[in-house]
Amino acid sequence: PEYYLTRSDWVLLFLGLKNKKVIFECHQYSRIRRIILKLVIKKKNVKIIFLNQELLRHSKFTNTVSNKLLVAHNGFDEDFISKGPINNGGKIVFVGSLTRFNEDRGIKILIDAFGNQEIKNQYSLTIVGGPEEEALELKKYILSNNVDAEINIVGPKARSEISKYLRDANIGILLNTSLNIHSYLFSSPLKYFEYIFSQLKVLAVDFPAHRELPYSENIVFFEEGNTDSLIKAIKNTSNVKPLQSDDVKTLTVNERVKKIIEFANS
């Protein structure tokens, strides 16, 4: 092939040392990966793609190799999402795994926010994702805390079913834990791109990784673990206009592939 594209450290090392043309996608770091990257970046046929700007910064590569480095965020699959959202006012949705690297994502703060009378009266919440036992725990949490609000915990759903939940909402939320450096600094959540392509407003916990996302100036941020900050952010979504399809047309998976091909040929 013209270029090998890999996310394997060992494939990168083997091909790089053989002077094969190889592009490595870097989504996070390990001690071994840092050693390998430092070694192979000296090879003329090695190029590296970083999932976000923070990953590039933490590589500590100098400007002498900048032509071999590319930042390419995730993108959305146009075949997955039905365009033309219903955009019902006041409907918040979270879609994704309820845990991250076996750690709590902080989902319960969403439920806590509905203890606020204004939020309870004006908004509803749908949480789509698993595992099933975590979804069950959230249902128990609602009951044990006597949360009398329109909150729907639907559990894990097939990918083919998720688009209907996006179309029936107008606010999407990004949650994660700062206990994991990947979540805090290096992620480029696929769900974000699906949210904005579905023309949802976006709420996000205030992490550097989320600040690096395309159109992050349109995200309403809140402080991790702070219910009052989340409540304020939910209310502030009324001041935000969702992105339109023309705004995000360059953020598709197909456009990402084109960018990578251009990078390979540069």
Q: Where do the protein language model's features map onto the residues?
A:
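Short His-centered aromatic/hydrophobic patch
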Residues: 5-11, 26-27
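Nucleotide-sugar-dependent
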Residues: 101-105, 160-162, 172-194, 204-212
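C-terminal alpha-helical cap of glycosyltransferases
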Residues: 233-240, 250-266
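Conserved acidic donor-binding segment of nucleotide-sugar-dependent glycosyltransferases
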Residues: 216-227, 234-239
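A short alpha->beta transition loop at the rim of the catalytic pocket in nucleotide-sugar-dependent
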Residues: 170, 197-199
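Conserved donor-binding/catalytic core segment of Leloir-type glycosyltransferases
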Residues: 49, 76, 85-115, 125-126
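Nucleotide-activated donor-binding/catalytic signature segment of Leloir-type glycosyltransferases, i.e.
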Residues: 129, 136-166, 171
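A short, active-site helix/loop in glycosyltransferases that binds the activated sugar's phosphate group
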Residues: 14, 31-34, 42-81, 212, ...
